[in-house]
């Protein structure tokens, strides 16, 4: 899937953004995050000097260092010395010493999305937005374009497994990018094609707690398209459907709905593989096999198909790409089948942290492995989200057979009374369907699992915090309870 660019191709790419030739060194504050690291990697491959800082090393910073970036651990004013521009993520506080120093030195400070917008400015940009499904849809579209020989640049919010990275510099005019609505920074982007997968109440602090403001922001995002641009929108989502009359751009809709322009029919699932047919006006029906489970992933794939079809990608390339798709990191990530006593347990890790995301993950697990007992380790993400969606979480989580509840991963937030894992556990228990177990520390998990796991269980680790590290620890130890206790 990947090829290395030669010097001539790199020189051609550098001419795409002529004014960026004035820039020598680009410094990223918070470079270890998925969104920041992707842009840093593309710019590094374009030949720019890249530096960055983060609190601690991780696999991402190790990879960037190997590719030539200079990484500092800890934030210090001197880290920005010599930088032409400083790029910041929304997680960085305004009193961060590197931001303070950059302002004092009159070094331009830009947000992540502004730098992504510069990468997109002279390319054919395809931006994927929505509350859920952005990362997988971006990865699917990337796979299709590679299979068609179009060699796109891509910047994704998660690992594209077939590429082994979340970002890559291509030599064509196409740039496929995940567009982040969490801080409304996707309004900086000016793509040629925009996808909206769905719209739900999330990151509401950004929008003053007003859902109408969030909806208007998505409308504004779509109106950043040129008049000849294309909006691809999921008509199954009630909020997206509501907004359709307010969009003054060409629209193609997709979904299971009868009135979708690009429509899914005859969906079925066997274990990890979904199979369905996509109907398109004036085009042959596409009989699709997709190696990731769930109707939500059929929707993600159909969004990618709608864009690819509109841009003339060959049907055979589309079908091959979807069949060969390996998935994205931490999205129903099958980590293995592990022997435990008299049988085996299937381990799956998933990033979903909104009630709707957790719900579709549960449904995918039930559809593909209906005879397995579903055991979930759930880690709530952010106190504010837990508070705002408390009853929705309680309703969704009671659908599993066994629930192990961790405490909230704060993501830097101050604790909110009553919006914690123990309280949520108590509420779910009071609803009477299941008897969840609150696990106060990660170190307590092995002994709890030793008493819980049974032959042929499906163990699902769920959440956007460090529960993913727990999943990989469990996989590394092959669910050996004794070994986990020793750890």
UniProtKB/Swiss-Prot annotation:
One GO biological process term: peptidoglycan biosynthetic process
User: What is the name of the protein in this document?
Assistant: UDP-N-acetylmuramate--L-alanine ligase
For this record, an example GO cellular component is: cytoplasm
Q: In which pathway does it act?
A: Cell wall biogenesis; peptidoglycan biosynthesis
Task performed by this protein:
Cell wall formation.
Keywords noted in UniProt: ATP-binding, Cell cycle, Cell division, Cell shape, Cell wall biogenesis/degradation, Cytoplasm, Ligase, Nucleotide-binding, Peptidoglycan synthesis
The reaction(s) this protein catalyses:
UDP-N-acetyl-alpha-D-muramate + L-alanine + ATP = UDP-N-acetyl-alpha-D-muramoyl-L-alanine + ADP + phosphate + H(+)
Q: Name the gene that codes for it.
A: murC
What NCBIfam families does the record tag this protein with? murC (TIGR01082)
């Amino acid at each position: 899937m990947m090829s290395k660019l030669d010097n001539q191709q790199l020189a051609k790419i550098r001419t795409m953004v002529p004014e960026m030739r004035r820039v020598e060194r680009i410094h990223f504050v918070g470079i270890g995050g998925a969104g920041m690291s992707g842009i840093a990697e593309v710019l590094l491959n374009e030949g720019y000097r890249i530096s960055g800082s983060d609190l601690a090393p991780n696999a991402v910073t190790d990879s960037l260092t190997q590719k030539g970036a200079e990484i500092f651990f800890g934030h210090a004013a001197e880290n920005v010395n010599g930088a032409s521009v400083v790029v910041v993520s929304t997680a960085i506080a305004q009193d961060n010493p590197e931001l303070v120093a950059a302002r004092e030195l009159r070094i331009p400070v830009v947000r992540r999305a502004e730098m992504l917008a510069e990468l997109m400015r002279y390319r054919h940009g395809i931006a994927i937005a929505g509350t859920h499904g952005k990362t997988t849809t971006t990865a699917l579209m990337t796979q299709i374009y590679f299979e068609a020989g179009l060699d796109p640049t891509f910047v994704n919010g998660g690992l594209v497994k077939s590429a082994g990275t979340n970002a890559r510099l291509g030599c064509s005019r196409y740039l496929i990018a995940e567009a982040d609505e969490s801080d409304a920074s996707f309004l900086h982007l000016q793509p040629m094609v925009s996808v909206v997968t769905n719209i739900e109440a999330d990151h509401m602090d950004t929008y003053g707690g007003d859902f109408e403001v969030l909806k208007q922001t998505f409308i504004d995002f779509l109106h950043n398209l040129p008049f000849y641009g294309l909006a691809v929108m999921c008509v199954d989502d009630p909020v997206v459907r509501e907004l359709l009359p307010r969009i003054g751009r060409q629209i193609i809709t997709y979904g299971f709905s009868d009135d979708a322009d690009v429509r899914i029919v005859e969906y079925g699932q066997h274990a990890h593989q979904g199979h369905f047919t996509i109907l398109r006006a004036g085009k042959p029906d596409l009989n699709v096999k997709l190696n990731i489970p769930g109707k939500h992933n059929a929707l993600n794939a159909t969004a990618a198909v709608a864009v690819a079809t509109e841009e003339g990608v060959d049907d055979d390339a589309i079908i091959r790409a979807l069949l060969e798709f390996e998935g994205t990191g931490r999205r129903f990530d099958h980590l293995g089948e592990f022997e435990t006593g008299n049988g085996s347990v299937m381990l799956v890790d998933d990033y979903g942290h909104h009630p709707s995301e957790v719900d579709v993950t549960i449904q995918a697990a039930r559809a593909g492995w209906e005879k397995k007992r579903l055991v979930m380790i759930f880690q709530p993400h952010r106190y504010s989200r837990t508070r705002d969606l408390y009853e929705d979480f309680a309703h969704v989580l009671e659908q599993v057979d066994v629930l192990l509840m961790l405490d909230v991963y704060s993501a830097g937030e101050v604790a909110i009374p009553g919006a914690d894992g123990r309280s949520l556990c108590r509420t779910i228990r009071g609803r009477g369907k299941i008897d969840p177990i609150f696990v106060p520390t990660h170190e307590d998990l092995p002994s709890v699992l030793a008493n819980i796991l049974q032959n042929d269980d499906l163990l699902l680790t769920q959440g956007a915090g460090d529960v993913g590290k727990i999943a990989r620890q469990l996989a590394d130890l092959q669910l050996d309870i004794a070994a986990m206790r020793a750890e």
